[in-house]
Amino acid sequence: MNTIIKNLLFCFMLLILSACDEQNKTTNKETELVPKSAIEQINRQISEVPEDVGVHYYGLEQNLQRYSPLTQVNDGNVHQLKPSWVLSLGDNRGQQTQPLVINGVMYITSHNATYAVDARSGRQIWKSIIQYPAETLTCCGVTNRGATWYDDVLYRATPDNRLLALNPKDGKTIWEKRTAEIEFGYSMTSAPLVANNVVITGVAGGEFGARGFLDGWDPKTGEHLWRFHTIPKPGEKGSESWQGDEWEHGGGPTWLIGSYDKELDLVYWGVGNKSPWNMREGAKDNLYTQSMLAIRPKTGELIWHYQFTPNDGFDYDAVNDPILTEIEVDGKQRKVLIQANRNGFFYVLDRSNGKLLRANKFVDKVTWADGIDIETGRPIISERVKNMIKTGETTEIWPSAFGGKNLAPMSYSPTTGLAYANTFNIGWYYTPVKQEYKKGVFYVGAKFEWILPDEPKGYLKAID
């Protein structure tokens, strides 16, 4: 955890001290928001922490736990926190990025720029503009979710499918590589992951029928090392789970970052929806959509997979954060992967082999399945869904594509042993329809109407 302490300590103390010293006014521009005495106190506190630490990773660490051991901010003083500075990114698009903080510099991404900001003052150090074609296709809003730091280089993706290596001192591009073409619906929104000296990237585009993949890149040169397609072509393992030429436009996007276990040397990455969504009688499982993949970072070799929702019809993307931890299961300490899936079930997998250990509802209302069979690992499809597949009738389904949980990150505390997740309480009326593939057009094969309950539509939940 020492890789996050220095800069998080600074940020937390900055907020607390600015609140506590609210009465101390100053006209000095450098300390307009925080008194000089507070700055000196912060600097004294962080001086004991090594200079080379920071928030280097999306999710704070590569296990994606988002856990901080800091205790200064607690339920007794959290109400004192107030903003110390505000920085406008000059854009009205959604901001979903997680900043990085390295040696007092905060690195922030938006869809069309990368920023370096002095974390103490909010002063912009540099801004690197990203230009991309207006006709770039995106499913659900133009956004970017962050960058990653490795060996003194900043890596980020762009909406038009470029991977950039940036010099963190001035924001200039060291190298850039294109991963896919925009006319097929591909885009890139996630932060890259660096594992065993390989930069790994995923793509969005499942709603357009874009065939998903993961790429591995050399961090020094940008050389393309490997590609793993999430939809196998005929003759490849898993191709028997598709019919005819469905695989060509089968979806399987990889639009959120994965996690990494250095000891096992495995990258864990979730795969999203199949295209189109609609479920049909006689349809097969459609691997590796709605699955968790364990991949060797040097080669892209698939070691194991677990499919959460075979032949999914409801856009239950399995890309939600795969958090890594160790817990006791049936009296034995196990290295596990946990995920709050969009389909409304919370999963615990043995991350060495993909074996399902636990699966329970974490939202109140789940109607698409009656449960998960622990022996087979497969969902027990409800009678209402079986009838919908047979008749094509409009059916009330819970949860909706918003999921039991969507892309908002979950966290895990090894202190409490609990996971903390933002959850949804939204259903939909769903009708499967036939649809032919057309390049650059939404390819979902469904009509739907949201069901918004009178009671709260979302909750923060703690999950054992």
PLM regions and their residue ranges:
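Extracytoplasmic beta-rich repeat domains
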Residues: 87-98, 127-148, 176-191, 208, ...
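Bacterial signal peptide processing site
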Residues: 21-23
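C-terminal motif of bacterial Sec signal peptides marking the signal peptidase cleavage site
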Residues: 16-19
